Amino acid sequence: MSQTHLSNQKFADLPLHPEVKQALAENGFEFCTPIQALSLPVLLQSKDIAGQAQTGTGKTMAFLVATFNHLLSSSIPEGRQLNQPRAIIMAPTRELAIQIAKDAILLAKHTRLKVGIVYGGESYDVQRKVLDQGVDILIGTTGRIIDYVRQGIINLNAIQAVVLDEADRMFDLGFIKDIRFLFRRMPNADQRLNMLFSATLSMKVQELAYDHMNDPVKVEIAPEEKTSKNIKEEIFYPSQEDKMRLLLTLIEEDWPEKAIVFSNTKHSCENLWSWLEGDGHRVGLLTGDVPQKKRIRILEQFTQGQLDILVATDVAARGLHISDVSHVYNYDLPDDCEDYVHRIGRTGRAGNKGVSVSFACEEYALNLPAIETYINHSIPVSNYDRDALLDDIPSPVKIHRKHPAGARNLRERSGAGRTPGAHRSGGRPPRHDRTRRQP
């Protein structure tokens, strides 16, 4: 294969259930990614897996294919009740759970298996109606799953397959006690297929695996490569005064098809949104306090191309599967080295090329040495000509506090005097090659 992100292993050559093969073929899945090629032969023998793989490697489809195949090839537990799912997939964030559910629905099309999803931020009653009808594969965040288990709405005695995705993130967010609580209410480890995936297989993650899994096979994909070779990284050292002007100038030069701008705080993200919106970009804002329905709407707009730029805190850095992100801008260097890897991992996915641009300003430059040590390479430095930065930038729009993240509503109240999205429809032309020179 000339596409290095795929292996030579075809899904059609694996001993998969016919309905799974049909769904894969209809959705264009022909060749496995490396993590799929390594893990599926093991899982199809009903052996447990502890897999190390970063986001964007295809691990989601690996555990979904294995889960569907296992349920379709196994007998339904005797005496199973309507409130007893046969498989459970746990994710650290609702965004990741939603994406997993979307992929699961693709595989479920030709099967009799029902997929359900539960997570915080949505109505208990709405989700309960789905559960009351019975689900075979339950996908969700641990907190909401535990709520339903404690209420007796869900019973885990018929679980035949378990997936724990992004286990390292589960530790970061303090969910491990919840996970152990759920494991203790399932059949014994040797009576179910167990799958754990993590960006790092640290000692604490491996301990969790061996405590609640049946002698799992360890599968690793290029653990020494923290960042993808498909991502072109660079870093600027702007003054605080130049920082916003530099970002706006670079965006106008790069003209990204789809970009994510990361900042470390909600306040900074809101400020970024205001300037980008005022400059005529189609931009959405995603922070931790955005209501779930609005969050889903913004992500759909970004995915469907109605928005070109997403401004986000690290709530969006993990678990989002958004294709064709061409650029990532780290307006602030993150305090956590792993967050840098997860941020820039939003681009350069599935063999595509991507660009990551970071700013080492006075406030966050001290984070850079630890990041470069963690990723095991220096980030190339780019310089800029201060006199070439944009100087005719419109004023930022003001955020209406009752509607903190709805780009459409905010634009209607901005009074900025420019056509929304003017850059994309014949507005001010981009100023190419005005800021960069060879370092």
Swiss-Prot record:
**EC code(s) of this entry:** 3.6.4.13
Q: Where is this region: Disordered?
A: 395-439
User: Does this entry carry the keyword Nucleotide-binding?
Assistant: yes
User: Which GO cellular component terms, listed alphabetically, does the Swiss-Prot or TrEMBL entry include?
Assistant: cytosol
* Entry's Gene Ontology molecular function annotations: ATP binding; ATP hydrolysis activity; RNA binding; RNA helicase activity
What keywords appear on the UniProt entry?
ATP-binding, Cytoplasm, Helicase, Hydrolase, Nucleotide-binding, RNA-binding
Q: Where is this motif: Q motif?
A: 9-37
What sort of enzyme, by top EC class, is this? hydrolase
Where, by residue number, is the motif DEAD box? 165-168
> Basic residues bias located where?
425-439
Write out the annotated subcellular location: Cytoplasm
For whether the record's keyword set contains Hydrolase, the answer is: yes
**Pfam families reported for this sequence:** DEAD (PF00270), Helicase_C (PF00271)
> What's a single GO BP term from this record?
RNA catabolic process
Principal location class: cytoplasm
The residues that the entry says bind ATP are A53, Q54, T55, G56, T57, G58, K59, T60
Q: Where is the Helicase ATP-binding domain?
A: 40-219
The record's listing under InterPro entries reads: DEAD/DEAH_box_helicase_dom, DEAD_box_RNA_helicase, Helicase_ATP-bd, Helicase_C-like, P-loop_NTPase, RNA-helicase_DEAD-box_CS, RNA_helicase_ATP-dep_RhlB, RNA_helicase_DEAD_Q_motif
Under catalytic activity, the entry for this protein gives:
ATP + H2O = ADP + phosphate + H(+)
Role played: DEAD-box RNA helicase involved in RNA degradation. Has RNA-dependent ATPase activity and unwinds double-stranded RNA.
Q: Which family does it belong to?
A: Belongs to the DEAD box helicase family. RhlB subfamily.
This chain belongs to the protein called ATP-dependent RNA helicase RhlB
What is the species of this protein? Answer: Shewanella oneidensis (strain ATCC 700550 / JCM 31522 / CIP 106686 / LMG 19005 / NCIMB 14063 / MR-1)
UniProt lineage = Bacteria, Pseudomonadati, Pseudomonadota, Gammaproteobacteria, Alteromonadales
